[in-house]
Amino acid sequence: MKRRIIEVDYTEIGGFEASGLLTSEQVADYVRETIPTSHLEQCPNIQYEPDNPEFVSYPYGLAFFDPETHEIKVGPAERFGLIAPEQEMIDTVTHEIGHNAHQNLIEHRLEIAAKWADLYERSKNGENDFVSRYASTNEYEDFAESYMTYVRDPGLLQFVSPEKYALMRDFIFAGREYPPREVGRE
């Protein structure tokens, strides 16, 4: 099968045809229509790469973001859920783009990164306003999970942590808000 690469801004998206779940065109269309292009800055590629050695080291990992290269690699299709694996793959791509956006904040907007770190610490110290168990792992996963939830299920983030929702809306997405997730659609 020919490896198809689609460019979104300066980010190459490719290899997803091999997943059997989504095409590179579908992923690129989603990213183009949904994610602010500034969130792709410094991210050279988003690749479906199930044979990447990182996935041997992390047998349950769905994807990873490399903070040095800003590359995003998505893992084997069989690791995605049985009920809606296509949506889980899109959720995962969104989560990994969230890591890229967070890394760019750390590198260029320390005051916003510090606000996020403070929200994470407050959550960790008793407020328990995480959108998922995985979000409680560390401030990086909290940001990426909250980013994904802001885009994919904004009502959940607004319910769980109005402060994190407001920070995402005001500082990360420049006021852009997403429609609520429709029950039964995803």
Language-model regions: role of each:
Residues 20-35:
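Export/targeting segments at the very N-terminus of extracytoplasmic proteins
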Residues 7-22, 39-186:
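Active-site-flanking segments in enzyme catalytic domains
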Residues 1-5:
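Disordered inhibitory propeptide/activation segment of secreted metzincin zinc metalloprotease zymogens
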